[in-house]
């Protein structure tokens, strides 16, 4: 009788354990997709019109504390105002065919690069899937050189997993 009860306890424990729901919510008017974990904000994939590149902002810990800085998107008392191209979290490179995609600061900030700046323009949300413990967002972006020509198309899948 001891073994069946132990097995039953294990099965019940596994059935009661549940992974957090990871939900993607598109806000077309704001040009962003919010990532929620059990209904609480984790981050947003943002692709605002005046942005030089799509990014994740802000990033939060599991307890909800924001750990990315606000500058240059917003002013936060006591926060440093250097490196205006360090806008939350993003993926790109510093030199693609002689164009700098890394150091592209927002309009009005000084240029640090001797190379021309490129832009990464969000084109489309290709797929969104929310679920228990994991969500995925597939997007497409064009990398645009300073002369306006497209150097590459980037299709990427961002995967968000909830801690167990």
Region spans (language model):
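Beta-strand-rich N-terminal accessory domains
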Residues: 20-84
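Bacterial N-terminal signal peptides that target proteins for export
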Residues: 1-8
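Short, intrinsically disordered/low-complexity patches at protein termini
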Residues: 3, 15, 59-60, 66-68, ...
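Hydrophobic h-region of N-terminal signal peptides that target proteins for export
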Residues: 9-19
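Extended, loop-rich substrate-binding clefts of extracytoplasmic carbohydrate-active enzymes
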Residues: 82-163
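Short small/polar-residue motifs
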Residues: 18-30, 41-42, 116-127, 155
């Amino acid at each position: 009788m001891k073994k069946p009860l132990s097995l039953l306890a294990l099965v019940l424990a596994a059935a009661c354990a549940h992974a957090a729901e990871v939900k993607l919510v598109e806000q077309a008017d704001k040009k962003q997709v919010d990532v929620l974990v059990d209904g609480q904000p984790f981050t947003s994939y943002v692709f605002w019109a005046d942005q030089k590149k799509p990014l994740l902002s802000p990033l939060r810990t599991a307890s909800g504390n924001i750990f990315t800085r606000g500058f240059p998107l917003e002013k936060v008392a006591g926060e440093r105002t250097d490196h205006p191209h360090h806008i939350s979290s993003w993926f790109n490179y510093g030199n693609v065919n002689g164009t700098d995609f890394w150091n592209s600061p927002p309009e009005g900030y000084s240029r640090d690069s001797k190379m021309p700046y490129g832009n990464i323009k969000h084109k489309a949300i290709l797929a969104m899937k929310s679920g228990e413990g994991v969500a995925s967002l597939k997007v497409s972006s064009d990398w645009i050189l300073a002369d306006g020509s497209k150097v590459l198309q980037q299709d990427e899948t961002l995967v968000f997993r909830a801690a167990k």
